[in-house]
Amino acid sequence: MLLNVKGLDYKALNEALRQNSGDITIENCCGQRFIAAGMTDKNITINGVPGNALGAYLNGSTIIVNANAQDAVGDTMNEGEIIIHGNIGDAAGYAMRGGKIFVKGNAGYRAGIHMKAYKEKVPVMVIGGTAGSFLGEYQAGGVIVVLGLEATGKKIVGFFPCTGMHGGKMFLRSECKDVKFPSQVTARPADESDMKELKTYVTEYCDLFGYDMNEVLASPFTVVTPDSKNPYKQMYVAN
């Protein structure tokens, strides 16, 4: 189904999505917020730029955006996939606890903030370009991958990555010699076991966006995890 949303507010747009089943293509999207919030079993393609909180509370749908997206993509996402053929704004994956977000380009500040795993759910976010400051802030679970493709000399992450990180894992396609991590996390070169896990995420990314998986994986990766011997203590209540 083709849905022209020019001039439509987000409430009317979401109501139209709920009333229709099957594959839906949204045309002339221009900043409408909360698209597909909390929706299940939808396949949505968006032509245009969606506003903040795209796919918030998503619970099993697939969203493809053929452009950039704004802030808080996948906020508190539970299940499903969000695929962005462009860049995303700040706070992508805020508190997501399941599902996958794939971004062809760059991410703004605070990507993966408060990301967490829930029971058998493990959220995954793959950023093809670079990520801004405070990547993985307060990360409690899940996986963040940053590939730094076409970065043209730019650092793969901004300032203060992993601040407050106390769970989960991060893969960075770089030796990270110019990245300053907090003392409460451990950054080390990826080993064979790490690369086996990483291959799953990178393969899916490359299939979506047309990159060569072997070429991407040929570069060195750094794995970042919380340091159990030196955890953040002042930010959290002890169990």
Regions from the PLM with identified roles:
Residues M1-N239:
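Long, distal/terminal scaffolding or interaction modules
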